[in-house]
Design a protein with these regions (language model features):
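Hydrophobic positions on the alpha1 helix immediately C-terminal to the Walker A/P-loop
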Residues: 257
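Conserved internal helical-beta-strand scaffold that buttresses enzyme catalytic cores
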Residues: 1-252, 262-587
Length: 587
């Protein structure tokens, strides 16, 4: 289709004049185009075609050894003032950043093709969806974006003649880590990324647009862009499906929870995946908060993904998937540690070097190696995942990895208290052998690296949203990672986390009472269903639900220190902290 949008044409012309590509290709999203790009990638060595008998439509890619993860120290929010970026972001004046990056982009696409990639975040035609255009000199980026977004002519049709689209400019340049920048210009709805070829830095639709820029749009337009999974739980007995969103820092089992398979006792229940990473949420006239998954695929961490830990994720990757920085077997299959399959005698590791049995298995695939897979292939994908209105949210979960502090689950007293629970979220590193508690890392709403503006204003926006949502979701905190005196996990986790979700929904439906404590409402042990869970008694659940005053006094001190780091902390959060102190003082 011929693009006539004058704003797009002018911007592409300006960026091409800067980057000087040999040619410009306007992408249409067709299968023929995909095949041509794949063939070119294989011919150039950018990608390796995997064994099509085992993994049809799958390809393998290695990034540069210095380019394997998001780089928070090279990621900038270039708002007009430093105060607008706030304490959680690196800031540079927008004029200064444009001046710094313009020479780096000058001629960066010489000898290459510039691909013009239009895409939609969210289901086509949804009142919640947004259009972006990414210009890139990387075919690998194009093929990833084909999976992660709804791209091509469908996006041009949705954009029409509108000027409101998010502009993304990406060039691999020469993958120089010292000149690597991922810069966001919220007032221009623009992202510039240079000298990286790694997923999170270059698939600009993902964290850059769907969280950092979208969080700014959400504040301006009274909606929410959150780092959250969305799952649906269907109760066949009632015919009712209820939806839960959840924010978890990394290494807390977010994708596993999004794709959970209920334990055998829970006959008549089904869990559906709407999204595994990002939720865009908006109040609708019926009073409910509705959520969409703006993405079209999963960009998942490969190591540890197995038929035991997350069968739905592994099955999603069996076709039409791009694997990045995993190990490559001699029969052109993929391998990583924790896959549940023994390592073969010989492989090529993620660096392209020989790997032989006896070598370190953890080193075969990079710890942050990835799969990019279409969400539509997920066995647990929700029938509602492309509903343009989204799904109504009954509950919001916050969670982290806490050895001693947080009980298995508790419910906030109300919305504002729930915002306090999310704002004080933390995860800790544990030395498993000694059970020693390590460093506590605060990660508010699991959004610390992704809030596109001042974090204090972000908390204020959460509080403001509470005034707009008539039928507010209940807010809970979960902790699958409580440990005993020996440092062993006290809860089995994985599919058994459904037992906690079941209690959460019973609270949403007003079907069960709870015990009021200084931190919130905690279950009665008898209300967590232990059917079929061998070796667990009500007494074990009691231990998982204990709240130790001395441990929480330490936690309160940690929260005070955390809050001291914000320049625009809403007074309501200080009030919530004081109220919690008062409740503990009364115990």
């Amino acid at each position: 289709m011929v693009v006539t949008n004058k704003y797009v044409l002018k911007w592409v012309e300006e960026m091409a004049a800067l980057t000087k590509p040999d040619k410009i290709v306007w992408l249409d999203g067709s299968l023929e185009e995909k095949k041509k790009l794949e063939d070119e990638c294989v011919a150039s060595g950018e990608m390796i075609e995997l064994n099509q008998d085992i993994l049809p439509g799958c390809f393998y890619h290695r990034t540069a050894a210095n380019d394997v993860a998001r780089v928070e120290d090279r990621t900038f929010i270039c708002s007009k003032t430093k105060e607008e970026a706030g304490p959680t972001n690196n800031w540079m004046d927008p004029a200064e950043m444009y001046a710094k990056l313009t020479p780096l982009f000058d001629g960066s696409m010489k000898g290459r093709t510039m691909y013009v990639l239009p895409y939609i975040m969210g289901p086509a035609g949804s009142p919640l969806s947004k259009v972006g255009v990414e210009l890139t000199d990387s075919r690998y980026v194009v093929l990833n974006m084909r999976i992660m977004t709804r791209m091509g002519d469908i996006a041009w049709k949705q954009l029409g003649d509108d000027s409101e689209f998010v502009k993304g400019l990406h060039s691999k340049a020469d993958i120089d880590a010292d000149k690597r920048y991922i810069a966001h210009f919220p007032q221009d709805y623009t992202i510039w990324s240079i000298n990286s070829g790694y997923g999170g830095n270059v698939i600009l639709a993902k964290k850059c647009f769907a969280l950092r820029i979208a969080s700014v749009l959400a504040k301006e337009q009274d909606w929410m862009a959150e780092h959250m999974l969305i799952l649906g739980i269907e109760n066949e007995a009632t015919g009712k499906t209820q939806y839960v969103t959840g924010a978890f820092p990394s290494a807390c089992g977010k994708t596993n929870l999004a794709m959970l398979i209920p334990p055998a006792y829970a006959k008549g229940y089904k869990v559906f995946t709407v999204g595994d990473d990002i939720a865009w949420m908006r109040p609708f006239p019926d009073g409910h908060l509705y959520a969409i998954n703006p993405e079209n695929g999963f960009f998942g961490v490969a190591p540890g993904t197995s038929m035991e830990s997350n069968p739905n994720a592994l099955l999603t990757t069996k076709s039409n998937t791009i694997f990045t920085n995993v190990a490559l077997t001699d029969d052109k299959n993929v391998w990583w540690k924790g896959m549940g399959v023994p390592a073969p005698a010989h492989m090529i590791d993620w660096l392209g070097k020989e790997w032989n049995k006896g070598d370190d298995e953890k080193a075969a695939a990079h710890p942050n190696s990835r799969f990019t897979a279409p969400a539509s292939q997920c066995p647990s994908i929700s029938p509602e995942w492309e509903n343009p209105q989204g799904v109504p949210v009954s509950a919001i979960l916050f969670g982290g990895r806490r050895a001693k502090t947080a009980p298995l689950v508790y419910q906030s007293f109300d919305w504002n208290h729930g915002v306090f629970v999310g704002a004080t979220m933390a995860s800790e590193t544990t030395a498993a052998a000694a059970g020693a508690v390590g460093v506590v890392r605060r990660d508010p709403m699991a959004m610390k690296p992704f809030i596109g503006y001042n974090a204090g204003d972000y908390f204020a926006h959460w509080l403001h949203m509470g005034t707009l949502i008539e039928k507010k979701p209940l807010i809970f905190n979960v902790n699958w990672f409580k440990t005993d005196a020996e440092g062993k996990f006290m809860w089995p986790g994985y599919g058994d986390n459904f037992r906690v979700l079941e209690w959460v929904l019973k609270r949403c439906n007003n079907e069960v009472d709870a015990r009021k404590t200084p931190i919130g409402y905690v279950p009665y042990a008898k209300d967590i269903d232990l059917t079929g869970l061998e070796g667990y008694t009500e007494a074990d659940i009691e231990n998982l639900l204990t709240i130790e005053k001395d441990v929480w006094e330490e936690e309160i001190a940690g929260i005070e220190k955390h809050f001291a780091g914000f320049d625009r902390l809403p007074a309501e959060l200080e009030n919530q902290l004081q109220a919690m102190k008062d409740r503990f003082a009364a115990v």
